[in-house]
Amino acid sequence: MKSTTLQIKTSSHTQMLDITRQIQDAVTGSSVKSGICTIFIPHTTAAVTINENADPDVVRDFTTEINKIVPWEDGYHHMEGNSAAHLKSSMIGFSEQIIIEDGRLVMGVWQGIYFCEYDGPRTRKVIVKITEG
């Protein structure tokens, strides 16, 4: 099993960053030809998801709609003032698994891997575990 940790610097309070290239680079560097790539976000106010990366309007729509579902101000009880970030992260999720074949991530032509920031800007970690098999 190979492991790497990526450092991600976000520049906005809410942001989706396409990290597909960095994840593929980790897979390539592992020399694993067939297996599973697990992506884990060790934060409670950030997430990871797979979505379309061909049209930037998809990211804009995603961000707009999740902000409607979970508004920043809504009478939350959590005293740190970032309850919405915790809720969004739990809804989107902290991990993804992607099949590796021939040393490449098996993804649809329009799919990309997105790091989702919900309480930025911050420096974040993305843990990538690559399992051969």
Regions found by a protein language model. Name each.
Residues 1-133:
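Active-site histidine-anchored catalytic micro-motif
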